[in-house]
Amino acid sequence: MQKHTKIKGFAKFRLIFILALMSSIAPLSTDMYLPALSQVKQSFETSEFLTQLSLASFFVAFALGQLIYGPLSDVFGRKIPALVGIFLFMLSSLFCVIIDNIYVFIILRFFEALGGCAGVVIARAIVNDLFELKEAASIFALMMVFSALAPMLSPSFGGFLIEYFSWHSIFATLFGLGILLFLLIFFALKESAPHLKRQKFSHKETLKNYRFVLKDKPFILYVSCASLVLAAMFAYITGSSFVFINFFGLSERDFGLLFGLNALGFVIFANINAKMVRKIDSEKILFYALIIMLISTLILFVNSLIKPNFWLFELSIFTSIALLGFIAPNTTTLAMARFKDHSGTASAVLGTSQFALAGVISFIVSAVGANTPVILALIMLICVVFANGVYFAMKK
């Protein structure tokens, strides 16, 4: 099988930049939009429910759309489906600027996500095409550093656009991002899977490939771990503002700084992981990171259950989120490495599983009202316990 492991220097930097940008479409399209929700509600003179539905429609399409692009990229190559998806994202973003109907806006957000998810699922497949295990783990870690910076900076940038322009400027910016990404993919990204046997796309063949991927026990192990620890992070993202502001009494400004600090922990650990995987096996890093995260969330829960101490709570949260910088890139690498000829399909299963479970956990956190430390800590602990349970049970 053809392997391109000699990509170095500027060519490698350019490739990582393009793939990281492709992977960051979701946080850029959602987190930059969050500060605009109230303004969108007023602009369309609509209800809060319909305004929130514009977010929900995006998440649903982003999760399900990956199941389409994965198999398509295994048949038609990576580049063409990526270009089609980004073009749809670009076009939908443009129409979001000019329409004046909330129902049309919700539909456009659906198609915006349906296009944007192509970048995420195909970026993972490209890394799997071009790099061997250790190098792939390093590349995934660097991509995730960029992806972690996006949610840190996007809300502030979105707030800036709203303050000086209007909510329409957010989608004008996303349209511009789409143009940039389309041009980069078209001119600077080579087809990474020319070795694939091109065949006519069929539903029967697609289902066959999905069955083939889902029968692989180690793949399911890594996907389950990746999805469960990411769900723990989404529980934190959904419930942390209520806990830190309403329970511990932090101001919105202080919470924003604390949220950024915790995200910085992820960035630092992912950078460390990018260097560690060149000398230490990904499986070994994952093994210890899962155990330490279990200990960290257990301390978080016990502290919350007895008498919540702010500094111990924050230290446990910081450690848990930072450890994702070890766990996320290594589970992704180990899962994707199982399938070199079905990278797109494998990436689709991984992405959809992560996004779907994260959505369910976020809904549970919102539904139960995780506005006290003990509830948030319990949900995070359950996710991490299951992640460890699945990992060690399937490793026997």
Spans of features found by a protein language model:
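Helix-loop-helix hairpin linking two adjacent transmembrane segments in secondary transporters
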Residues: 104, 142-187
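Paired small-residue
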Residues: 88-95, 103-111, 311-319
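Helix-breaking motifs and short loop linkers at transmembrane-helix boundaries and internal kinks
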Residues: 45, 77, 98-104, 115, ...
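C-terminal transmembrane helical hairpin of 12-TM major facilitator-type secondary transporters
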Residues: 284-330
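Juxtamembrane intracellular "pre-TM" segments in multi-pass secondary transporters
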Residues: 2-9, 192-223
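Cytoplasmic helix-loop-helix junction between adjacent transmembrane helices
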Residues: 108-149
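A late C-terminal transmembrane helix in Major Facilitator Superfamily
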Residues: 334-370, 379-380
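Conserved MFS/SLC helix-loop-helix module at the cytosolic interface between two early adjacent transmembrane helices
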Residues: 64-103
